[in-house]
C-alpha cells in the first residue's frame, strides 16, 4: 500500500466530517468490514472523527446501517485533531473543507466525497447515501490493493 507520509507502518485512512455522526461513521464501519474481508488489518489503520462532534450517531444512520447487518449503535462521535491527521496517508472528507481539517505541511492525500448530510433525511434518502458510501469505500480499498 502506498504511504504518503514518512511513516513506514500501515497506511492510515481517516474518515472525517463535521459531527462524526453520520457519513464518516458509515464510511468507517464499511472500511472496517473491508479490512476484515480483505485481510488487511496489519496493513491499514482506520480513524474517524469530526471537527465539532455531535453527542450521538444519528438514529437514521444507525437504522440504515442495521439494514446492512452492521451495528453502529454503540459508536460515539469523537473529535479529530490535527495530531490525529498528521500521520494519516489519506483524509477522506464527506463534504466539508479539508483546509479546516488537514494540518499545514501535511504530506497525505485529501479526497472530498461531497456527500449529502443524512441528518433529518428520509430512510430512503439515508439508504441512498449509505449505499454511495459503501461503493466509495469498496473502490478506495480496490485502489489501495492495486498499489501493494
Provide a role label for each language-model segment.
Residues 42-43, 90-92:
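Short, charged/polar low-complexity linear motifs in solvent-exposed/disordered segments
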Residues 1-8, 89, 99-100:
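Polar low-complexity intrinsically disordered regions
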Residues 2-81:
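Conserved active-site segments centered on acidic
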Amino acid at each position: 500500500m502506498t504511504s504518503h507520509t514518512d511513516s513506514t507502518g500501515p497506511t492510515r485512512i481517516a474518515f472525517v466530517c463535521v459531527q462524526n455522526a453520520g457519513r464518516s461513521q458509515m464510511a468507517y464501519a464499511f472500511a472496517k468490514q473491508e479490512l476484515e474481508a480483505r485481510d488487511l488489518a496489519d496493513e491499514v489503520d482506520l480513524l474517524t472523527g469530526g471537527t465539532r462532534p455531535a453527542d450521538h450517531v444519528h438514529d437514521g444512520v444507525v437504522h440504515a446501517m442495521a439494514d446492512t447487518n452492521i451495528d453502529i449503535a454503540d459508536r460515539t462521535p469523537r473529535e479529530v485533531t490535527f495530531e490525529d491527521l498528521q500521520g494519516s496517508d489519506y483524509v477522506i472528507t464527506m463534504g466539508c473543507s479539508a483546509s479546516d481539517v488537514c494540518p499545514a505541511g501535511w504530506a497525505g492525500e485529501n479526497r472530498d466525497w461531497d456527500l449529502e448530510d443524512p441528518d433529518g433525511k428520509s430512510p430512503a434518502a439515508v439508504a441512498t447515501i449509505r449505499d454511495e458510501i459503501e461503493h466509495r469505500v469498496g473502490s478506495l480499498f480496490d485502489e489501495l490493493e492495486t498499489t501493494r
